[in-house]
Curated annotation (Swiss-Prot):
Cofactor: Zn(2+)
Name of the protein this chain belongs to: Replication initiation control protein YabA
Binding sites annotated in the UniProt record for Zn(2+): H84, C86, C100, C103
Keywords, sorted A to Z: Cytoplasm, DNA replication, DNA replication inhibitor, Metal-binding, Zinc
Protein family (similarity comment): Belongs to the YabA family.
Native source species: Streptococcus mutans serotype c (strain ATCC 700610 / UA159)
Main subcellular location of this protein, as a coarse class: cytoplasm
One GO cellular component term noted in the UniProt record for this chain: nucleoid
Length: 110
């Protein structure tokens, strides 16, 4: 193997290392994004669980008609916080706080 061939081999090896490094950086970024998204979803989930617990306690303590209006008010608060309250997407964050026809039907039906 002459010097030129040896140089070409090292050059190819160097290029492969650079490509592998770029792929590793891309994977690292993806993992970081997923970890951030997971943390955000965990916070949302905890918040929704707290609200659900609060609603359950309210329901057990006051089953009168006042509790019904209180439940509706709580659903409105959840909806205003940017979460779906409909059966199709319950607990999911609304995209760009756009109105959901299913949620609106739940809020405003008589």
């Amino acid at each position: 193997m002459d010097k030129k061939d040896l140089f070409d081999v090292f050059d190819g090896f160097s290029q492969n290392l650079m490509e592998t490094l770029a792929e590793a950086e891309a994977l690292k970024k993806q993992v970081q994004d997923l970890v951030e998204q997971n943390a955000s979803l965990r916070l949302e989930n905890d918040k929704l669980r707290d609200r659900l617990s609060h609603f359950s306690q309210m329901e057990e303590s006051d089953p009168s008609s006042k509790a019904i209006s209180s439940r509706k008010e709580n659903l409105e608060n959840i909806y205003e916080d940017g979460f779906h309250i409909c059966t199709f997407f319950y607990g999911q964050r609304r995209e760009n706080n756009e109105d959901c026809a299913f949620c609106m039907e739940l809020l405003y039906r008589e």
